[in-house]
């Protein structure tokens, strides 16, 4: 393999770029990581994109796109640095689907050693509520476009002074690790209550709402139709739920084109899924929030729709550093802290609404894999990484509640 190294600024470590020795024999859809400082070259790369997996806002910040393999020569001709993330995204999806079709007898004994669809996750959180009814209960907080329940598992909340907290995952359908991480966090909090003092203290002093699958229609569609589907299932093209909230709605990083992956919907809160979250937050007066996504290994705080610093920027930075540090301690995976807009502008996000309207301390966490060291997985993260990613997510949730209790 040919090897090239490119260092970028902004405090990000040098990135190592691996290239194919030669292109594939027939055109395929390939996910690549691009780094370019020149806006014209960046625009050229983006014009070739069939899909955008991660975006870059800082100068020189790498971004991941999907292109036809026969477009790579165009990038080379314009001296645009790129590296392969997933050599053939459709082959990766087929391999994953084949693995998931294994008979039940051949599946791992550990439920979190493999991915699960919406129905299986729904059954699992229902079992958690039945396992510990004195401290866990399951609630349908709304229904999706296609009528699927949006399940929220309530854990704790027995004390009058319990901190109302929300964690949610899978606003974007293809981000399977977010569904598994939120479910795994809930599982750990329920099952470890009697044996882990830190967990017991958390549950006793928190009213935690866990919504593992915000986008059940899109998530299920990604299992049976299009592994890389992002939006909900409104009409033919869907709506990006994380562009459908009212703060900054219609702003940068969202589109009025319904075919775009960041289509914001006809108006703010046009979708039943975002309405369900809004109503839950207002009803329960949620004070602390984490929106789990993938991928990138990032801890992000408001604002995303504007470069204007948040009123509580120093507080967000200090607490965000606590989260990143807690996550690092678990498996020595580094999560990078930044204001959301530094990554890329995005109007109408849940985290901005949680902070700007609900006045909650809200973070977005982009889970594994990272986007700095040439990782080659994208959204199809190997199942053996579910447990360690869950450990990192749980560490962040515990650290956030602790910081809130300390008045930070």
Predicted stretch roles:
Residues 1-3, 9-408:
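M14 metallocarboxypeptidase catalytic domain recognition
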């Amino acid at each position: 393999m040919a090897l090239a190294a490119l260092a970028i600024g902004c405090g990000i470590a040098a990135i190592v770029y691996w290239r194919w020795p030669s292109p594939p024999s027939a055109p395929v859809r390939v996910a690549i990581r691009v780094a370019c400082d020149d806006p014209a070259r960046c625009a050229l790369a983006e014009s070739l994109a069939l899909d955008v997996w991660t975006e870059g806002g800082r100068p020189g910040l790498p971004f991941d796109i999907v292109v036809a393999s026969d477009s790579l020569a165009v990038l080379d001709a314009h001296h645009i640095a790129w590296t392969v993330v997933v050599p053939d995204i459709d082959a990766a999806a087929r391999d994953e689907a084949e693995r998931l079709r294994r008979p039940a007898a051949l599946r791992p004994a550990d439920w979190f050693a493999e991915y699960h669809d919406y129905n299986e996750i729904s059954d699992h959180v229902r079992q958690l509520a039945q396992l510990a009814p004195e401290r866990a209960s399951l609630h349908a907080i709304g229904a999706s476009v296609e009528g699927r329940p949006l399940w929220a598992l309530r854990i704790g909340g027995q004390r009058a002074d319990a901190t109302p907290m929300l964690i949610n995952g899978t606003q974007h359908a293809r981000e399977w690790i977010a569904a598994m991480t939120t479910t795994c966090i809930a599982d750990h909090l329920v099952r470890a209550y009697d044996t882990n003092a830190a967990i017991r203290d958390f549950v006793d002093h928190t009213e935690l709402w866990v919504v593992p699958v915000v986008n059940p229609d899109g998530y299920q569609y990604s299992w049976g139709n299009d592994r890389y589907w992002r939006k909900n299932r409104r009409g033919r093209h869907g709506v990006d739920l994380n562009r459908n909230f009212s703060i900054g709605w219609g702003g940068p990083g969202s589109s009025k084109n319904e075919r775009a992956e960041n289509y914001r919907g006809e108006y703010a809160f046009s979708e039943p899924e975002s309405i369900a979250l809004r109503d839950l937050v207002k009803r329960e007066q949620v004070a602390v929030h984490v929106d789990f996504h993938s991928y990138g290994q990032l801890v992000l705080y408001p604002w995303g729709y504007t470069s204007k610093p948040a009123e509580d920027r120093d507080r967000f930075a200090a607490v965000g550093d606590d989260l990143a540090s807690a996550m690092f301690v678990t498996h020595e995976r580094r999560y990078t802290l930044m204001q959301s807009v530094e990554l890329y502008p995005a109007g109408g996000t849940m985290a901005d609404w949680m902070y700007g309207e609900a006045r909650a301390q809200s973070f977005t966490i982009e889970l594994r894999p990272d986007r700095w060291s040439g990782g080659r997985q994208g959204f199809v993260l190997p199942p053996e990484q579910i447990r360690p990613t869950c450990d990192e997510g749980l560490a962040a949730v515990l650290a956030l509640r602790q910081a809130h209790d300390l008045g930070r």
